[in-house]
């Protein structure tokens, strides 16, 4: 497993009173291997290499131990693939890695529920270096399109406290993080909620690749640009671990990356390689950037009502203003 490491970059607009806050983080990009022992071994090697490189936190891809199931509809009950959050194999595996390597380890799983339809939650978790489960966040937005039929497997995460900020207690200090998942990364509202909540870093564990209905359309550049934009407009570091390789109908394209609040890529993985990205972040750069460009201070929440209004669509599926706000000349086609 190759390791690609980025030392800390200087701030582009250092505040006069700034105090640097370095923290080293890592992600592991992997492919799903049918043999569960070999699959775990590649993750174990990646986490160990991250620890050897000085990482205090390592982030793993979506549905860490399993094949991506949603390229097709379930043939039986969806919960045949689900597991207990507290006592299932994923958290047990993360506990083992975290205590052995003495660092915080993030992962993701298909969390079982008692829902009659068999759907569970797509849940991100964090285990600290003592093996304690210190954070969990359920995926809020669920994709519904060809090759990513997740609505047949996962329920939407609860709206109440949907975007919690977790304080990780590291040797370098406290690190406030958010743990949304994959499809959440396309929604600017999610990054903004975390930014307003005081997060300094978001991890989006991801499973993204080809589009079965449009095999020649490479969405990787759009995916990266979207998340880089969220980083800039919310003053956030972003850690985005993806998988690679062919699984069913999807060719996952890797390209995992880490980005800072200035939009600088601190590392990007190849499309077709299991590897580790390591980067030392200066958390104080969030304060630097948001002091120069005070997005939160100059917001206009009183003008944002339409953002939380139900969506009305015309017969082409394009959103139009809600009936209360629409003038006669804006009526749906």
How does the language model describe each region?
Residues 25, 126-134, 259-267:
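Short, glycine-anchored, charge-dense loop/turn motifs used at functional sites
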Residues 31, 61, 140, 205, ...:
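Conserved residues at the C-terminal ends of beta-strands
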Residues 36, 45-130, 134-136, 145, ...:
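Cys-nucleophile CN-hydrolase/nitrilase-fold catalytic domain and related Cys-dependent amidase chemistry
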Residues 86-106, 176, 182-276:
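CN hydrolase (nitrilase-like) catalytic-core segments centered on the catalytic cysteine
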């Amino acid at each position: 497993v190759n390791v690609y490491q980025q030392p800390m970059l200087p701030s582009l607009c250092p505040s006069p009173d700034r105090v640097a806050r370095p923290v080293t983080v890592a992600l592991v990009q992997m492919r799903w291997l049918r043999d569960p022992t070999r699959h775990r071994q590649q993750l174990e090697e990646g986490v160990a290499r991250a620890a050897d490189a000085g990482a205090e936190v390592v982030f793993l891809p979506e549905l860490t131990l399993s094949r991506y199931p949603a390229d097709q509809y379930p043939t039986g009950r969806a919960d045949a693939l689900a597991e207990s959050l507290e006592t299932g194999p994923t958290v047990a595996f993360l506990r083992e890695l975290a205590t052995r390597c003495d660092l915080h380890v993030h992962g993701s799983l298909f969390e079982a529920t008692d829902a009659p339809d068999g759907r569970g939650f797509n849940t991100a978790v964090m285990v600290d270096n003592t093996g304690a489960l210190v954070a969990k966040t359920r995926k809020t937005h669920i994709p519904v399109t060809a090759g990513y039929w997740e609505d047949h497997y996962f329920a939407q995460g609860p709206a109440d406290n949907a975007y919690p900020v977790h304080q990780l207690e590291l040797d370098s200090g406290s690190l406030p993080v958010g743990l949304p998942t994959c499809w959440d990364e396309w929604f600017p509202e999610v990054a903004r909620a975390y930014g307003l909540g005081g997060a300094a870093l978001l991890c989006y564990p991801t499973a993204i690749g080809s589009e079965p209905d449009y095999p020649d359309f490479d969405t990787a550049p759009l995916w990266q640009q979207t998340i880089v934009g969220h980083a800039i407009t919310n003053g956030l570091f972003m850690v985005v671990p993806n998988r690679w390789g062919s699984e069913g109908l999807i060719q996952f394209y890797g390209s995992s990356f880490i980005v800072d609040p200035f939009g600088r890529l601190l590392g990007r993985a190849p499309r077709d390689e299991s590897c580790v990205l390591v980067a030392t972040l200066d958390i104080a750069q969030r304060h630097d950037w948001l002091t120069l460009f005070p997005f939160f201070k100059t917001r206009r929440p009183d003008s944002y009502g339409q953002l939380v209004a139900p969506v009305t669509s015309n017969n082409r599926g394009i959103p139009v203003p809600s009936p209360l706000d629409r003038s006669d000349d804006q009526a749906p086609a």
